[in-house]
A protein has these predicted regions:
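NAD(P)+-binding Rossmann beta1-loop-alpha1 motif at the extreme N-terminus of oxidoreductases
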Residues: 1-45
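N-terminal beta-loop-helix "entrance" segment that forms/cooperates
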Residues: 40-51, 144
Length: 220
């Protein structure tokens, strides 16, 4: 999937969405980034620089544009963004969920606003029953989404989703983005663990005072 030209719709124009949109564009794909306000000055400025060659549109336009869709809004805005985009615009598509349901209301470090017997990934799949949702990109900082390299080696990307073909497609995207190791942890309910790993990642960053770290699976 990743080795052919694709139309990709990225919903979310913050740091995560911009980094993923630029990554897909760098691999030759036709990318639209979706925003509630596609004309906002900071997005227009980004499109004239790092985002050159990427179109901007509404959430609905980006979702309709993509053969592959990426959800990269703030976790607490995810369900509203899906409603604005129109669930029908995701029908039959692979949807990458790159979000975490972080709650900073109690200060730092954040907590998960969804936990226990549910997760944001599962809510996304329920909101998009005709799409094939794969959780990915949520356990690493956005500067390392594409061509990730650390002084100690290459990190592992953990993914979860119910559809095997969709997970293979996302693994292809990751390989094209320079990830040498992708590990499938199972169904979309694995988002519970992946979202919790994000909290660990944030706590480590807070303790270190730096965000240049990732996780790697080592097998003995």
């Amino acid at each position: 999937m990743a080795n052919r030209h694709m139309r990709v719709g990225v919903l979310g124009s913050g740091q995560v969405g911009q980094r993923l949109a630029a990554g897909f564009r760098s691999r030759g794909h036709e990318v639209m980034i979706g925003s509630r306000n596609p004309a906002k000055p900071e997005l227009v400025q980004w499109l004239s620089g790092e985002g050159a060659g990427i179109e901007a549109g509404t959430f609905a336009a980006a979702a309709a544009h993509g053969e592959l869709a990426v959800l990269a809004v703030l976790g607490n805005a995810a369900e509203q963004a899906i409603a604005e985009a129109g669930p029908e615009n995701f029908s039959g598509k692979v949807v990458i969920d790159a979000m975490n349901p972080l709650d900073f209301s109690g200060g730092f470090p954040p907590k998960l606003s969804i936990a226990g017997e549910d997760s944001l990934g599962e809510r996304v799949q329920r909101a998009l029953p005709d799409a094939r949702v794969v959780k990915a990109f949520n356990t690493i900082g956005s500067p390392y989404f594409v061509d990730p390299t650390f002084s100690d080696g290459h990190p592992t990307m953990l993914i979860a989703g119910d559809n095997e073909d969709a997970k293979r497609a996302v693994a292809d995207v990751l390989a094209d983005f320079g990830w040498s190791q992708t590990v499938d942890i199972g169904g979309i309910e694995g988002s519970r663990e992946l979202e919790a790993i994000c909290i660990a990642w944030v706590k480590i960053g807070g303790a270190r005072g730096a965000w240049d770290h990732g996780f790697k699976l080592l097998v003995g």
